[in-house]
Amino acid sequence: MTKYVFVTGGVVSSLGKGIAAASLAAILESRGLKVTLLKLDPYINVDPGTMSPFQHGEVFVTEDGAETDLDLGHYERFISTKMRKANNFTTGQIYESVIRKERRGDYLGKTVQVIPHITNEIQAFIERGAASATCGEPDVAIVEIGGTVGDIESLPFLEAARQMSLRLGRNSACFVHLTLVPYVATAGELKTKPTQHSVQKLREIGILPHVLLCRADRRIPDDESKKISMFSNVPEDAVISVWDADSIYKIPQMLHDQGLDRIICEELKLSPKDADLSMWSALVEKLENPKQEVTIGMVGKYVDLTESYKSLIEALRHASIHTSTKVNIEYIDSEELETNGVDSLKHLDAVLVPGGFGRRGTEGKIAAVRYARESKVPYLGICLGMQLAVIEFARDVVGLKQANSTEFDPDTPERVVALITEWYDREGKVETRTEESDLGGTMRLGSQRCPIKPGTMAEEIYGKDVNERHRHRYEVNNRFVPQLEAGGLIISARTPSEDLPEMMELPRSMHPWFVGVQFHPEFTSTPRDGHPLFKSFVEAALANKQARGVQA
């Protein structure tokens, strides 16, 4: 029978509930337990797919094509269990499901209310999400409840968790509360009152936390922990200090050293083997002791909010671990390149253009592509970054001066990149779309396997085929591919059913390392294994730095 750990947050948002939940999962997995995680989001949006990156940050895409919260990316990076659509749900999905049932008559004419109908539906979604785990029936399901205790949006989720813990009985569920202990510089001390009030708020709705994770910019002294314990009615050894760390991969060891996994296992009556965190220690050791260094420029329009590129940043960090290289990322606003030129790129060892949507800043990204191609600087284009590389090549090499994407210019006569109107989903069903289709849930989403052209750089990196995740509406237009190939561009991978270009590259006679991919490889990178594409990219950046005579 699956046991549940509910993770809540207090005082302020963005304390790191996702990292805390993922770190606990990593420790429990190292003890031989099968673990899955769920994220419950209190917003009314059905999913984050149409939300602004400035509002929500990155949209993480699962293997089965769900657009989910970025915390699911942390979950996959910390444990071996893969996430699915059922691992993340929102208030919007809950109400949508309940209203659909009401319209069908499932409630037999009863008045539909938050309690019991909404809370029952939340519990059903939680149990369904746990049961869908790719690891089989999990021993433990860790359920992260988004938002902050006291928010009206979170109340139905907290009530559902309370009811569920009561229904499951003792030793089947426990609560971990993450809260802030701020340091007040003028007083020169940490203040525990916000944590006391947060726990009181939780107790008012019937939830008694078993563990407090106290976030601070420094380790919390024992006397402050005793005070928190006394006022919150939580045992002193269960008041755990979580201070700022320079790497999230240090958090599992930090929590284990303070006995978090022991407390959870005792509360849930689990008797697994001892934790083995040697892998995490080895990763941190490599991360902190690089042998060389490179600087990679990430050219985008969301650079003021790096959460928009969370998985990409982590993928580069994983590559740094597996190449013993410190990777410095410089965030470059593509709109500034449009006005100030590309001089700010000249010191870079490599250029990366990530995915994105909309016309704003695209000409600046194209300028970055042109600079990388002409200067023989390693270039990696992801999703939109590949499309813009093709547009730049079409304009400046092939001579199609009006080449563009219909996303930016619907009337362009040279539609090098255009809307996909028909494709097959993961189940082999034909999906169709037009310019008038809804934005939500109408992209090509999820994993798709495709063969790689022999003799290409793509084959050197991936092998015979590639299986990566997608999130896009537009594709390179096959009508222009013969002209692009005549100019030297190589389409190194295509989808097997629709023959859509998946990867492009330039031959080494034209450029040492120039690759574009239509998919999002960052979603499958993990600190354990890294990712072959990002590893190759960092190695190319190193080679470029050494070729320029700069000490790596």
Swiss-Prot record:
Q: Entry's Gene3D superfamilies? A: 3.40.50.880, P-loop containing nucleotide triphosphate hydrolases (3.40.50.300)
Q: Which GO terms are recorded in the biological process aspect for this UniProt protein? A: 'de novo' CTP biosynthetic process; pyrimidine nucleobase biosynthetic process
Question: What is stated about the way this protein's activity is regulated?
Answer: Allosterically activated by GTP, when glutamine is the substrate; GTP has no effect on the reaction when ammonia is the substrate. The allosteric effector GTP functions by stabilizing the protein conformation that binds the tetrahedral intermediate(s) formed during glutamine hydrolysis. Inhibited by the product CTP, via allosteric rather than competitive inhibition.
Region annotation (Amidoligase domain) maps to 1-270
Transcription as a keyword? no
Where ATP is bound, by residue? 14-19, 71
Quote the record's binding site residues for Mg(2+).
Answer: 71, 144
The transmembrane segments are: none
Q: Name one GO cellular component term.
A: cytosol
Q: Which CDD domains match?
A: CTPS_N, GATase1_CTP_Synthase
Question: What residues sit in the active site?
Answer: 383, 520, 522
Give binding positions for L-glutamine: 356, 384-387, 407, 473
Occurrences of domain Glutamine amidotransferase type-1 (ranges)? 295-547
Give the pathway annotation. Answer: Pyrimidine metabolism; CTP biosynthesis via de novo pathway; CTP from UDP: step 2/2
Where is CTP bound in this sequence? Answer: 13, 151-153, 191-196, 227
Where does this protein hold UTP? 13, 191-196, 227
**Pfam family, any one:** CTP_synth_N
Q: Which InterPro entries match?
A: Class_I_gatase-like, CTP_synthase, CTP_synthase_N, GATASE, GATase1_CTP_Synthase, P-loop_NTPase
SUPFAM superfamilies listed in its UniProt record: Class I glutamine amidotransferase-like (SSF52317), P-loop containing nucleoside triphosphate hydrolases (SSF52540)
Q: Could you tell me what reaction this enzyme catalyses? A: UTP + L-glutamine + ATP + H2O = CTP + L-glutamate + ADP + phosphate + 2 H(+); L-glutamine + H2O = L-glutamate + NH4(+); UTP + NH4(+) + ATP = CTP + ADP + phosphate + 2 H(+)
Q: What does this protein do?
A: Catalyzes the ATP-dependent amination of UTP to CTP with either L-glutamine or ammonia as the source of nitrogen. Regulates intracellular CTP levels through interactions with the four ribonucleotide triphosphates.
Its family?
Answer: Belongs to the CTP synthase family.
Additional note from the record = CTPSs have evolved a hybrid strategy for distinguishing between UTP and CTP. The overlapping regions of the product feedback inhibitory and substrate sites recognize a common feature in both compounds, the triphosphate moiety. To differentiate isosteric substrate and product pyrimidine rings, an additional pocket far from the expected kinase/ligase catalytic site, specifically recognizes the cytosine and ribose portions of the product inhibitor.
Would you tell me the protein name for this molecule?
CTP synthase
Organism, scientific name: Burkholderia orbicola (strain MC0-3)
Q: Which gene encodes it?
A: pyrG
